[in-house]
């Protein structure tokens, strides 16, 4: 049976369009608020409302999938995201935009839960690494193309909203031509997010998603600031960030393939060790290109491998709840990491960004080197 079936390919096509829209809005919303002369703290609050919506959307999407299935959950999530987009054109203001970005955050989180859960339920323990790698490649490619679009088209609010909304609605179309079966509805027992978080045999996967959130959130949010403080121009900062993201895209498929072939535990150990090496290399500032490349290739691929690890440890009908738990863990890490790293950078030194990344990675490596409880035959083997 092919790994990349027709439903999987159509799902990824829809995700690409939605990710383009997400990337464009995440870039332009802070700029629109700044043009409206809102103070910096209000711009930050609007951004926080989006991430708060992510948390809320993550919590209830599993119940929705169980009730109405993957396809209808995907349609609803896309419509909620589109509503959050259209609402931005109603009135530019702090409270209005904070509400609409909260709604958009819910829709985006629902999309991620639906897509990730559908991919995991479509795969087996032998190919989930490749499926999640394809998912991350599409996600990062959409993010990259979204940034490219921002630089090529008019950034005016009322010029952007119509075609971005159209792109969101177009993202629904591929799923109209296929049906993704939700086998969870046939299960006798439902699983909760809290139960998945407490599952001892999957704890390394959950911890891996938290660490991945810390690493990626810190790199995404604070690497441009670090480079700016090194005296680089905006063009140079853009180049080095492109190197970082490109490495993450290029590393997805090989890491997924290696994880499926040699086991997720071994690959996780190697990934985390390489993240530590890349962080140390950044501190030396001797060879930034290879240091950033290996940091991106290992750091950006940690999340899908950790997800695949955790999903090996649960029954098939528990996959959606487990995915919610993993996405929630990643979101928490991506919120906490940049906040803590920014505080360290402001009060002490910019180099503490990489010291913090290396430190949390080292702690996770110690966990991985202990008895991981890996079983020769994964539970979720179908």
Swiss-Prot record:
Cited NCBIfam families: PRK03633.1 (NF002962)
Protein name: Uncharacterized MFS-type transporter YcaD
Annotated keywords: Cell inner membrane, Cell membrane, Membrane, Transmembrane, Transmembrane helix, Transport
Annotated CDD domains: MFS_YcaD_like
Compartments (UniProt record): Cell inner membrane
Membrane topology designation: Multi-pass membrane protein
Xref: HAMAP family: MFS_YcaD
Stated family: Belongs to the major facilitator superfamily. YcaD (TC 2.A.1.26) family.
GO cellular component annotations of the record: plasma membrane
PROSITE patterns linked to this entry: MFS
Keyword Cell cycle found: no
Annotated gene: ycaD
One Pfam match: MFS_1
Keyword Nucleus tagged: no
GO molecular function: transmembrane transporter activity
TM annotation in the entry: 8-28, 45-65, 75-95, 102-122, 131-151, 157-177, 204-224, 231-251, 270-290, 291-311, 325-345, 349-369
């Amino acid at each position: 049976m092919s790994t990349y079936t027709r439903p999987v390919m159509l799902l990824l096509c829809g995700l690409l369009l939605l990710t383009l829209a997400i990337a464009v809005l995440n870039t332009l919303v802070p700029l629109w608020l700044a043009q409206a002369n809102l103070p910096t703290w209000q711009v930050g609050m609007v951004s926080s409302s989006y991430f708060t919506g992510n948390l809320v959307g993550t919590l209830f999407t599993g119940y929705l999938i169980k009730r109405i299935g993957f396809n209808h959950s995907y349609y609803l999530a896309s419509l909620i995201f589109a509503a959050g987009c259209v609402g931005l054109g109603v009135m530019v203001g702090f409270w209005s935009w904070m509400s609409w970005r909260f709604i958009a955050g819910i829709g985006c989180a629902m999309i991620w839960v639906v897509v990730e859960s559908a991919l995991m339920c479509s795969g087996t323990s032998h190919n989930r690494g490749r499926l999640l790698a394809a998912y991350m490649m599409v996600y990062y490619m959409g993010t990259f193309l979204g940034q490219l679009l921002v630089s090529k088209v008019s950034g005016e609010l009322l010029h952007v909203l119509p075609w971005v909304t159209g792109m969101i609605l177009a993202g629904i179309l591929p799923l109209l031509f296929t049906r993704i079966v939700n086998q969870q509805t046939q299960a006798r027992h439902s699983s909760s997010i809290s139960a998945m978080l407490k599952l001892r045999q999957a704890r390394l996967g959950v911890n891996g998603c938290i660490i991945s959130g810390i690493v990626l959130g810190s790199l995404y949010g604070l690497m441009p600031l670090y480079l700016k403080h090194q005296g680089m121009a905006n063009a140079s900062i853009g180049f080095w960030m492109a190197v970082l993201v490109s490495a993450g895209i290029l590393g997805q498929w090989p890491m997924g393939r290696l994880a499926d072939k040699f086991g997720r535990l071994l690959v996780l150990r190697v990934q985390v060790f390489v993240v530590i090496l890349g962080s140390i290399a950044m501190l030396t500032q001797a060879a930034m290109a290879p240091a950033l490349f290996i940091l991106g290739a290992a750091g950006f691929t940690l999340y899908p491998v950790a997800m695949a690890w955790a999903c090996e440890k649960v029954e098939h009908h528990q996959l959606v709840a487990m995915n919610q738990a993993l996405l929630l863990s990643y979101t928490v890490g991506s919120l906490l990491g940049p906040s803590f790293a920014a505080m360290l950078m402001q009060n002490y030194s910019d180099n503490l960004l990489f010291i913090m990344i290396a430190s949390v990675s080292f702690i996770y490596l110690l966990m991985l080197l202990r008895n991981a409880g890996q079983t020769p035959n994964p539970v979720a083997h179908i």
